UniProtKB/Swiss-Prot annotation:
Gene: PKNOX2
Region (Disordered): 1-62, 351-371, 386-405, 422-472
Record lineage: Eukaryota, Metazoa, Chordata, Craniata, Vertebrata
Matches recorded under InterPro entries: HD, Homeodomain-like_sf, KN_HD, PKNOX/Meis_N, TALE_homeobox
Protein name: Homeobox protein PKNOX2
Species the sequence originates in: Homo sapiens (Human)
Keyword flag Repeat: no
Amino acid sequence: MMQHASPAPALTMMATQNVPPPPYQDSPQMTATAQPPSKAQAVHISAPSAAASTPVPSAPIDPQAQLEADKRAVYRHPLFPLLTLLFEKCEQATQGSECITSASFDVDIENFVHQQEQEHKPFFSDDPELDNLMVKAIQVLRIHLLELEKVNELCKDFCNRYITCLKTKMHSDNLLRNDLGGPYSPNQPSINLHSQDLLQNSPNSMSGVSNNPQGIVVPASALQQGNIAMTTVNSQVVSGGALYQPVTMVTSQGQVVTQAIPQGAIQIQNTQVNLDLTSLLDNEDKKSKNKRGVLPKHATNIMRSWLFQHLMHPYPTEDEKRQIAAQTNLTLLQVNNWFINARRRILQPMLDASNPDPAPKAKKIKSQHRPTQRFWPNSIAAGVLQQQGGAPGTNPDGSINLDNLQSLSSDSATMAMQQAMMAAHDDSLDGTEEEDEDEMEEEEEEELEEEVDELQTTNVSDLGLEHSDSLE
């Protein structure tokens, strides 16, 4: 040990004087360190001149030993327990569904500081580099814990909103579009698509079907024969793992189909059975509404009762039309068109039936003696006859013959009657055609028909006019 402390005065003397230092190979320390073979020492031994000009480095340390020494230094550091606690919290937040909050780590820091102060332990070591390393590691894990907390909050928010959306849009009651406790509620074991009267008419057959544990599927030929009502639905898993919905059918005559499942039978998939049944029900309920020009019976009964109660003035006001539309579940246009057609086809035949028959005949006979210049002035008729080569139809006194005048007006009368016929046909569809004429135009058409009847000398029935006497 005395020889190990001697190089310091030797280096000082070497710096002040030019005296060469003693040879190192003769010292026992050099011989002891030269025993393990190393590359650096071989260079110094082979070149004594180089060793004399440069200082000899210290002996190298094994990397594994250096690593173990660094580990021991980290383990002995005062901040290592805090670093370990933070690392465990990050592991728990990563593995489990419940994330450790950053507030809990703040509490742990306060507890650690109080404990260190009570035990009078330092927070740092004598190595500043190691202290800086420990502080940086704690900061990195702290940031990592904050990021894990944010990710966990986002995941929880997404899951909650997704579950709420599924409950809202994919609930069975919303799919069936019916209230809870209705005939199509999923709580009931059977789905009833026919009226209660049909089920009451065949109680024996229905009781036998409801107790059948296995459902029956009706072949395609049975569906093409007529109306079919589904009475019970039982889930069944067939080969391949697919879930189907076997259905027991009841025809419109009340007969229960009890055939076995044949080849090519219709199978209703479980995921689509609710929507298919609902669409079938909606189509059957709205079948009559889709027919053009046919109003519901209860609506026509309400409007007909109002019409008979106001025979003296069968013209409802706008407020009354709105009230009737609300009662009948119709539009204002449908209500207005119905009353227009009802005044023509219901009230007018009643008035005609109440009047005696000789009155129209007398009116027609009287109309033949009207002066002809109302429709065809003498000047116009005489000019037309002269252009045709004379006036063969004129009387000796210069007046116009009535037969010739009526023959001239036959074409125009026919056209007028055809127009009136087309207008009446357009109004035959109740509640579907738009209202293209008001009450004043109605009265003008009636006057036009009366004038045409007055001009016609032939029977009106020869024109083949057909009028509908019923109002749907």
